[in-house]
Amino acid sequence: MRKIAVFLLCCMFMCMYANAQFTAADQPLMNAYLENDMPAWRAFIHATDWEQATQDERQRVLAYEYGYCAAMMETDKAEAQKATQLFHSHVQAMEGLLPKGYYEMYLSAIYAFEFKLGQSFHVFSILRYANKALELAPNDPIIVGYMGNVLFYAPKGIGDKKKALALFEKAATLFETSQWKYCWNRPAMLLAAAQCYEKTGRKNEALSIANDLLNEFPNFTYIRDIYLPALHNAK
């Protein structure tokens, strides 16, 4: 369960579209997230001609590349390495073109992926760039949630689950007045909040969020098949 939870939590901020709008074309990929169908994301990434893509299209590709890298960390390290290298090159190409805080957030994610692959041990760079992103965009729900994610999973002595929970709660409030309220960023962030409540001994709050998510998204297979059953059985 731990590996799946880590994968899903990593993936939860994958749709960092910045200012690119969620469209009907994204709905199948949202369903792919809910149903853990990462090949659909890979197909989308490789079907996009980066050189010919518009800025919005490139932002969209970065969003799915991020999630795809996170997924491959648990299933195919060789593919994860290639995907991370491609993601890094694309992020560098977009320096100065992304909304405030997003370049730094992506760099933080790249350091996290490289750490997971054993290619980099700059743990503090993960936190440094995440903090910079939050400083630049303190009211962006995706960036706020990402910082919560970093603190949730950072090693002991660096991470802080209570601070992470406060950030997840802030992100949840910000999502309510955000263009992303109806995108998958919101349910994904709420899953993180549920997991954080669980890890801080607040099982009832975790159950409440998870049940609400399943009512809203019946095809959220991780919650339906893994998280809720395990949470019900937890002491």
Predicted features and spans:
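Structural register within alpha-helical repeat arrays
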Residues: P28, V61, Y66-Y68, L107, ...
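Short coil/turn linking the two alpha-helices of tandem helical-hairpin repeats
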Residues: G67-K77, S108-S120, F152-I158, Q179, ...
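Terminal, low-structured helical/coil segments at or just beyond the last alpha-helical repeat
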Residues: K181-K235
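The tetratricopeptide repeat
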Residues: E57-R58, L62-Y64, Y103, I110, ...
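Flexible helix-coil transition and linker loops at the boundaries of alpha-helical arrays
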Residues: A47-R60, H90-Y103, N131-D140, A172-W184
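N-terminal leader/linker segments that initiate helical-solenoid repeat arrays
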Residues: Y17-E74
